[in-house]
């Protein structure tokens, strides 16, 4: 029959050895208790033997307590549970006086990490494993695994080793001279595999691996083998601040190939050379003083190298950018240094070599007046790769404005604005032309007015989870007038020029960025904002619908786009977790009708399935429709599809069908078949197989 000995007998034991050094009551129990001479006067519990303390539990087939040394000896199916970690062993010795232990044939885990070892020893603060093997997730043939002759575990903090082998299951081909990992940081190992077939590439296989070299630094490489093109290889890296502050991080990716396939021509119609390569570097940093640093470098040997070999990275951003920006906050201000480079010779880039800018944020003065300002110096260059005159200018610019908000009631506000902008262009160059220096002084006058109306409605619907409605209605009217802005327009090189945008441009002179392409402006902007909200038990307030309308009315000289160009409408609604709708509409007021219409509708049922339908319409430019779907067929297996239809050309530009499934809760395997139409460089058929890590 089980016997228990509550350890009020503190003369024998003062505390559990691993959990704490201070005395604490523990309890021993077992099926039988042996106090005979054969035990040397020691307490021996056999059969379901247990030691239970405040924050630990030890069980085994047999537990022996040596009173003279305050030592537990456990053997046979030993299990020690401590602070969320669990250790199993064939034998374990626990010395209470110094908190040290030794064990053999050890298995231990603290999710998601599990380890085995021939021997283990240490204390509560540090455990040394000999003949160790650590896996991410429960040990198995597909789990990421690290094996080491000796491994040091710092419970709750991390692990370190002087030498180890890394791989998957029993296949561990990667040797590490030394490794360290803090549990509060992402795993410093990055693995990715891919493969498939495309007519333009042939059969191909791709791999990327980053291994830890020191805390916060992973080095490795990228390898791509293409039967129709050759071998692309290059170094890769990822780095981050090893401290908990996470003050800086960055990535490096590269590749070089001697391309023996059909390379076709580049963006400018020029033949592509066989030696092809790319380099991408990104860096983000934040100092203790609040200074932020952002840098990005994208070098391509030709305009198509990323599209040919890494299309997933190409299609989201098809024009590379390279810059370094340093922003330092001051008292209600920012000082910014920006340099923008043109390392490639196939895209037009407005270079800044460099630009230094000071922004004074709105600051109150006397009588309720607010001031704001900015000043900058920029050395601008543009060398069009497709031909045309080389443009250059050194520009000194300053802007200052005063405003006086006036809100006689909570529902009405009126803010007059008065400002001025001084711009000096020097060292002008437009091809062989050398226009003289240009000095331009502009004045700005205007106002911003708004009405704020609201209403509440006692509406409840448990299906849509609506608990009352609040409608916020905000009519807005703004006006800006800055005459003479086109002065010197024919002499100033148009480097910072107006770009195409589907949204309304900034109205004020202080927000305008195309300083080399200004026009005289006298414009009213009329807007109407609608917001519908309901109570939410988790978030307090949940937004059900947002509908904004706005349009510009030009007075004075008629602009090229007309006095009332278009009405812009934006709609977003999320009335329920399973429904989302977003829309953007631009309606021309000149009798041309609909100019642009973009929508997106998403339906989902938890994690069982989701479907998104969207369209993009731009008059005389494009009209396409896209469907993205996902459905869970069973646990760990999903069906995915993407369809893109071009209504103007009456064809499917893309049809993709695939399956995604998890392996050992660690790897995501995605296989897909794609059929393309209309693309000039990609094959009409493609098969892809990708293996990505789910948990590291």
Q: Model regions: which residues?
A:
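Structural recognition of beta-strand segments within beta-rich domains
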Residues: 27, 34-59, 64-75, 79-81, ...
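Bacterial N-terminal signal peptides
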Residues: 6-16
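A short, polar/charged loop/turn motif at coil->beta-strand junctions and beta-hairpin connectors
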Residues: 24, 39, 43, 185-187, ...
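Outer-membrane beta-barrel proteins and related beta-barrel translocases across Gram-negative bacteria
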Residues: 29, 33, 85-100, 107-128, ...
């Amino acid at each position: 029959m089980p016997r228990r000995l509550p350890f009020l007998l503190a003369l024998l034991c003062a505390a559990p050895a691993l959990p704490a050094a201070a005395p604490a009551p523990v309890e021993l129990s077992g099926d039988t208790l042996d106090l005979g001479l054969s035990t040397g006067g020691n307490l021996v519990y056999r059969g379901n033997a247990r030691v239970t303390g405040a924050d630990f539990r030890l069980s085994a087939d047999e537990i022996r307590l040596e009173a003279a040394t305050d030592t537990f000896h456990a053997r046979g199916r030993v299990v020690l549970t401590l602070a969320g970690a669990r250790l199993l062993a064939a034998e374990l010795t626990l010395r209470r006086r110094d908190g040290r232990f030794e064990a053999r044939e050890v298995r231990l885990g603290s999710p998601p990490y599990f380890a085995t070892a021939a021997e283990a020893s240490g204390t509560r603060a540090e455990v040394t494993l000999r003949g160790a093997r650590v896996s991410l997730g429960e040990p198995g043939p597909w789990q990421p695994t690290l094996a080491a002759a000796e491994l040091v575990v710092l419970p709750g903090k991390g692990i370190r080793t002087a030498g180890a082998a890394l791989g998957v299951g029993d296949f561990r081909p990667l040797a590490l001279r030394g490794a360290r990992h803090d549990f509060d940081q992402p795993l410093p190992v990055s693995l990715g595999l891919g493969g498939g077939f495309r007519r333009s590439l042939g059969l191909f296989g791709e791999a990327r691996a980053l291994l830890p070299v020191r805390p916060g630094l992973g080095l490795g490489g990228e390898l791509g083998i293409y039967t129709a093109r050759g071998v692309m290889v290059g170094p890769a890296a990822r780095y981050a601040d090893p401290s908990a502050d996470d003050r800086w991080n960055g990535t490096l990716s590269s590749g070089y190939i001697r391309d023996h396939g059909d390379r076709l021509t580049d963006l400018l119609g020029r033949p592509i050379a066989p030696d092809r390569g790319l380099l991408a570097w990104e860096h983000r940093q934040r100092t203790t003083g609040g200074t932020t640093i952002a840098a990005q470098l994208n070098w391509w040997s030709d305009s198509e190298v990323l599209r040919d070999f890494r299309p997933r990275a190409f299609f989201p951003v098809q024009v590379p950018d390279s810059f370094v920006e340093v922003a330092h906050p001051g008292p209600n201000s920012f000082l910014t240094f920006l340099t923008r480079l043109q390392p490639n010779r196939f895209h037009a880039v407005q270079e800044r070599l460099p630009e230094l800018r000071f922004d004074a944020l709105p600051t109150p003065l006397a009588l309720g007046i607010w001031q704001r300002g900015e000043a900058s110096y920029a050395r601008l260059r543009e060398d069009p790769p497709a031909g045309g005159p080389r443009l250059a200018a050194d520009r000194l610019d300053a802007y200052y404005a005063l405003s006086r908000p006036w809100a006689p009631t909570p529902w009405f506000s009126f803010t007059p604005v008065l400002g001025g902008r001084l711009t000096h262009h020097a060292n002008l160059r437009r091809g062989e032309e050398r226009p003289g220096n240009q000095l331009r002084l502009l004045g700005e006058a205007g106002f911003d007015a708004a009405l704020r109306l609201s209403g509440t409605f006692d509406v409840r619907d448990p299906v849509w989870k609506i608990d009352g409605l609040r409608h916020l209605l905000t009519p807005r009217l703004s006006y800006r007038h800055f005459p003479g802005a086109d002065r010197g327009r024919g002499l100033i090189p148009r480097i910072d020029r107006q770009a195409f945008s589907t949204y309304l441009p900034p109205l004020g002179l202080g927000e305008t960025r195309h300083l080399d392409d200004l026009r005289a402006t006298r414009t009213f902007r009329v807007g109407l904002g609608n917001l519908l909200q309901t109570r939410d038990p988790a978030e307090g307030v949940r937004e059900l619908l947002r509908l904004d309308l706005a349009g510009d009315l030009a007075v004075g000289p008629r602009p090229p786009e007309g006095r009332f160009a278009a009405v812009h409408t934006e709609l977003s609604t999320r009335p329920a977790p399973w429904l989302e709708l977003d829309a953007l509409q631009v309606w021309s007021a000149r009798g041309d009708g609909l100019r642009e219409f973009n929508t997106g509708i998403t339906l989902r049922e938890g994690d069982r399935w989701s479907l998104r339908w969207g369209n993009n319409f731009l008059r005389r430019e494009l009209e396409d429709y896209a469907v993205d779907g996902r459905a869970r067929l069973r646990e760990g297996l999903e069906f995915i599809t993407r369809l893109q239809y071009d209504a103007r050309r009456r064809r499917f530009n893309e049809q993709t069908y695939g399956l995604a499934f998890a392996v050992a809760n660690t790897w995501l395997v995605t296989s897909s078949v794609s059929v393309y139409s209309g693309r000039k460089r990609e094959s009409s058929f493609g098969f892809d197989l990708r293996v990505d890590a789910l948990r590291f």
